Amino acid sequence: MSAIRFFHMADLHLDSPFKGLFGLPEHNFKKIRTSTFEAFNTIIDKAIQEKPDFLLIVGDIYDGENRSLPAQRRFQEAMEKLFQHNIPVILSYGNHDHLNGSWTRFALPSNVYELPAETSVVQLNIRGQQVNIYGFSYSERHVKESKIESYPIASDQHVLHIGMLHGSEFSDTTHAVYAPFTKEQLLERNYHYWALGHIHKRQLLHQNPPIVYPGNIQSRHRKEQGIKGFYDVTLSQASVELDFILTSAVVYNTVEVDCKNMFHANELLKKCEEALSLNRQAYGASVVELHLKNIDEHASSLFEHATVDAWLETIREAEDGIEPMCWVQKLVLHTSSTLYEHTAATKSVVNLMEQWDITAWKDILKDLYQHAGGARFIDPLTEQDIKALMNNAQELLAEEIQRT
């Protein structure tokens, strides 16, 4: 049998509102606001050009359960384009766009298979190769129970079996648990490929057979850093090939500038401009956190008479009008540890923290560790955690002192 080819994507979050962005020029905000649509258009254009056998969209097509009209219209138009090119689409809805939401419905063309709330199978015949695709859509926002047992165990290995699942591993404590599973449970189904969604970070949980999170197609805030995209998958009974395709219209990223031995403001500005220019060349349009590292005794003088906010505004003005956009969302100062002792306030706080034992730290953090909703996601406090907390506290205190 010949190999099949499909695109695996998830978490489109079309029409995401992009909250928390302040002070952007209007043209920059519009670029960011429409970035999910631009990323999605990249996928559709690629599909029309490359003509894969089908597309898999694993949950959270829309950002909200109300499925905004602009998002639905653009998605429906994209499906019509794929229909004209005879490209099937198998999709599921996730926790953000579950079936129990309220929205004005658009009819999708016949090439689109919408998975229902109960685990179902879509069967395709591609050049003589039978393909079974299993999955479900969320009936409501919070699907906390495991759905794995509803997926049939594959027995006919002449058929290519693909599982679609919008959910998270039982062991993943960094995200709210939805439709939880273990890797072992997925492997027990004997499928040739697991197309996952829900986690916005690209991950390969297992090599053979592949258990794959493609991540989302466009970052929505500064915690979702790096390039985003989807997987172009070539699959046969004997082999699989995964090719990651970039779709990010705007990349969220961290840029670092070494400030050691700097004396003059123009020197720092030039270094920042050079670093942002390199980022622009590498990633195109971007939103960055600019980290000023190694601020020693010489460089600290640059912040004695100018606040961090003043520096941020000056750097933004220098970048304004340069295309593609590179918006500095946040400026972070990393003061050399040798400078902490130069302020009595910093020194007194550090001395106080050094006197606390692990019991004292637990008492200080008790509100966090006793929180009804969040406590189960937090690992037990360790000595390494305490050291990290102290270092972060010192940097934050030094930064706040320099802001005043």
Which sequence ranges carry the predicted segments?
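Hydrophobic pocket-lining residues that define ligand/cofactor binding sites across diverse proteins
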Residues: 47, 82, 279
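Binuclear metal-dependent phosphoesterase catalytic core
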Residues: 120-127, 214-274, 289
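His/Asp/Glu-rich metal-coordinating catalytic cores
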Residues: 54, 65-234
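Glycine-rich phosphate-binding loop signature in dinucleotide/nucleotide-binding domains
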Residues: 49-51, 155-157, 282-283
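Accessory, non-catalytic peripheral segments of nucleic-acid enzymes
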Residues: 247-404
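Well-ordered alpha-helical segments embedded in enzymatic catalytic cores
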Residues: 39-43, 74, 271
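N-terminal active-site segment of His-dependent metallophosphoesterases
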Residues: 1-69, 380-387, 391
